[in-house]
């Protein structure tokens, strides 16, 4: 089976800083893959290049065999790539349902937010997505009144609007309390399941990584330090030294 995502010799520099150093990686359909590494290791740079927010200096990014390395985020989304952000990208003055309705309408500016949010069909779809995450009772609450963990889930719900084949999540449990992190991740996995999307998630919490990832890719100074099943990677001596500090 061909990989849903294939990256070859991907390079990205910011001045003297090497953010991606000959990255080569295949991601099969249906896997849950966690990207780990210290701050600045290259994880978010990788996600930004795959989703079109950053152009690589060289190398190729193939989605189902289509070169997407120079496409815009909107174009990448049309082909089946979607993402959430470490800091949720929401309109705080709108309700949860209105934010999702804006995403459903494809309008990304503030100039005409209310009209699409009032369309019944879009609202029904918005509430359906919120129900997946157990958040339907918050549909009419303004984002400004919602806790950080709930905002994360709504941001991820927005990423599911297009039913992507590849979903990239940037630290889905950051800012979520220790008591809520497993519940949050359970909701994410459950909610993505109907679309059968491949999930790539950046994560610093090794408990989350070991519980939810089928495969772990460890980054260090723009390179892939280790790649394999969680137990193998998290016990790798170089990973323990440079990434986890011995923490599992």
Task: Specify the residue positions occupied by each region the protein language model found.
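Glycine-rich phosphate-binding loops of nucleotide-dependent enzymes
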Residues: 2-248
């Amino acid at each position: 089976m061909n990989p849903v995502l294939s990256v070859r010799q991907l390079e990205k520099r910011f001045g003297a800083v090497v953010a991606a150093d000959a990255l080569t990686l295949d991601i099969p359909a249906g896997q849950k893959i966690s990207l780990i590494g210290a701050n600045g290791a290259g994880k978010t740079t990788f996600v930004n290049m795959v989703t079109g927010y950053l152009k690589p200096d060289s190398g190729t990014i193939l989605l189902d065999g289509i070169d997407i390395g120079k496409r815009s985020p909107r174009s990448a989304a049309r082909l089946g790539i979607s993402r959430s952000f470490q800091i949720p990208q929401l309109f705080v003055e709108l309700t949860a349902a209105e934010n999702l309705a804006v995403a459903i309408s494809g309008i990304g500016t503030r100039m005409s937010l209310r009209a699409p949010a009032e369309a019944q069909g879009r609202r029904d779809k918005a509430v359906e997505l919120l129900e997946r995450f157990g958040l339907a009772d918050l549909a009419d609450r303004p984002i400004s009144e919602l806790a950080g963990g709930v905002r994360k889930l709504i941001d991820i719900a927005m990423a599911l609007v297009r039913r992507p084949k590849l979903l990239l999540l940037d630290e889905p449990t950051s800012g979520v309390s220790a008591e809520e992190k497993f519940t949050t991740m359970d909701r994410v996995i459950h909610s993505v399941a109907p679309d059968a999307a491949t999930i790539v998630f950046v994560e610093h919490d090794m408990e989350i990584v070991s519980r939810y990832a089928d495969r772990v890719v460890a980054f260090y100074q723009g390179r892939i330090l280790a790649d394999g099943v969680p137990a193998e990677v998290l016990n790798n001596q170089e990973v323990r030294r440079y990434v986890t500090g011995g923490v599992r």
